[in-house]
Amino acid sequence: MNKSTAALLCLLLLCSSTGVRADDLMENDDLAPSADLGELPPPVGQQALIDQNGQANLALLSQNGQSLLGRIVQSGSNQEAYILQQGSDLMALITQNGSGNAASITQNGSHNRAQISQNGNNNDASIEQAGTGLQSAVTQSGNGMSVSVKQYR
């Protein structure tokens, strides 16, 4: 075997092994999951809890942002509760005991806190917050009460 043939075989061998190494990198088995630079990191601290005991209760909780806490607890029947949060560092809590109660909390902004507690029947309460650093709490004990709180800053 002459030198040129041996050099050509060595070059062919090196080129073919380089292709295998590049192909192996395409599998990405050695990378951690979600390490793709094209993905956004998951939102920080979104927590939602809905706990229902009874019949015909309706609850809706929608969150968009970071560091959000939403909690709905219903005991009884025919109750409605809605929480909509958009922003950062928001907390909304709704607790309902009885029948036919309706409650809603809407929060836009940051660092807001809202709480509705209903004990009784056919009560209606709503809290709407838009801005920063707002706090509101509503407690209804009895029947047929209605309240609406709107805070803007």
Question: Model-derived features: where do they sit?
Answer:
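Bacterial N-terminal signal peptides that target proteins for export
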Residues: 1-7
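Sec/Tat signal peptide C-region and signal peptidase I cleavage site
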Residues: 18-22
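Bacterial N-terminal signal peptides
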Residues: 9-16
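Intrinsic disorder/low-complexity segments
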Residues: 7-8, 93
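Low-complexity repeat regions of mature extracellularly deployed or surface/particle-associated proteins
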Residues: 23-153
